[in-house]
Amino acid sequence: MGGWSSKPRKGMGTNLSVPNPLGFFPDHQLDPAFGANSNNPDWDFNPIKDHWPQANQVGVGAFGPGFTPPHGGVLGWSPQAQGILATVPAMPPPASTNRQSGRQPTPISPPLRDSHPQAMQWNSTAFHQALQDPRVRGLYFPAGGSSSGTLNPVPTIASHISSISSRIGDPAPNMENITSGFLGPLLVLQAGFFLLTRILTIPQSLDSWWTSLNFLGGAPVCLGQNSQSPTSNHSPTSCPPICPGYRWMCLRRFIIFLFILLLCLIFLLVLLDYQGMLPVCPLIPGSTTTSTGPCKTCTTPAQGNSMFPSCCCTKPTDGNCTCIPIPSSWAFAKYLWEWASVRFSWLSLLVPFVQWFVGLSPTVWLSAIWMMWYWGPSLYNILSPFIPLLPIFFCLWVYI
């Protein structure tokens, strides 16, 4: 290593006519640090080195005539240094042991208590002790903050957490809940608008049916077109404001609207009576009224707990209080039937007929259905304007 050896050289590198004692040329490893002065003759591993006697031949070298670097050129002995472009094929990626292809699902994040225990235990004694460490305190106290011995980490940690929340934002909302909560009212609104448009056609349809009764066998024509304000031929259901029949058309539609409103109120009354929300006291036997006296309580306790009274306290002429239970369903209908039976005694004769009709065999019911089917077209023309009201009645019946 330190100097030149006096031992005779062996093998290659013994010709000192080419001075290169320190390995100046690339890949010409004559530096003593590589063992040039040792007894190892195989220290130079250049695979394409020139034969040593050819070093003294005259040739055009990189440093002028008469000098040729003996080891493949000034730039080295690699293929790129010799001007040969060798393309090395890229190594294929190692075969994956995972047989599943495509993007794999994101793994579930660990709980906060495992990934950030300091956020879960910020008010504990152990965490306060951990804040004594400058490295931990630097995470929660900003630069230039308080560095006194007394620590009050609660507001600082709260502000730190709030700053983290302001950076990362709120969690992503559940789009499924938002979609379901948005589509529900939208469908209800669409169904309501459709029913409204259909209901608005009811007065016009009933008006057409009403006016057709005056023109049996012919096309209905407005009678006011030949008056002092003549108009073109038009239907009596679409009179212009200048037509004398316009006021009659408005009157007919107003009566139709009142009829539809009365029909809805009757249906609502029947529904409430069926649900037992009309606690009407029945008539006292042998009387036409339900006189309530000074009796405040019933002598017979009520059956069950209900928000409506379950009995009526009456005081006949004998002075004794009498308790009459209120039916849980159809109380108002029974009251009307009792009242009508007292006023019209002949209605009591219909009771056996009604009971017989209810107890008919299925054959009779099928015959009645067949007759209704036979008369169906004419009934449909009469009842078709009221078809849009059926969904509304059904919804009220189900949800009330």
UniProtKB/Swiss-Prot annotation:
Transmembrane segments: 182-202, 254-274, 349-369, 376-398
Polar residues bias (residue ranges): 96-106
Protein modification: Isoform M is N-terminally acetylated by host at a ratio of 90%, and N-glycosylated by host at the pre-S2 region. Myristoylated.
Name of this chain's protein: Large envelope protein
Pfam families assigned: vMSA (PF00695)
Chain spans, region Pre-S: 2-174
UniProt keyword list: Acetylation, Caveolin-mediated endocytosis of virus by host, Fusion of virus membrane with host endosomal membrane, Fusion of virus membrane with host membrane, Glycoprotein, Host-virus interaction, Lipoprotein, Membrane, Myristate, Transmembrane, Transmembrane helix, Viral attachment to host cell, Viral envelope protein, Viral penetration into host cytoplasm, Virion, Virus endocytosis by host, Virus entry into host cell
Designated gene of the protein: S
Residue ranges that the UniProt entry lists as topological domain Intravirion: 2-253, 203-253, 370-375
Lineage of producing organism: Viruses, Riboviria, Pararnavirae, Artverviricota, Revtraviricetes
All ranges on the Virion surface side of the membrane: 2-181, 275-348, 399-400
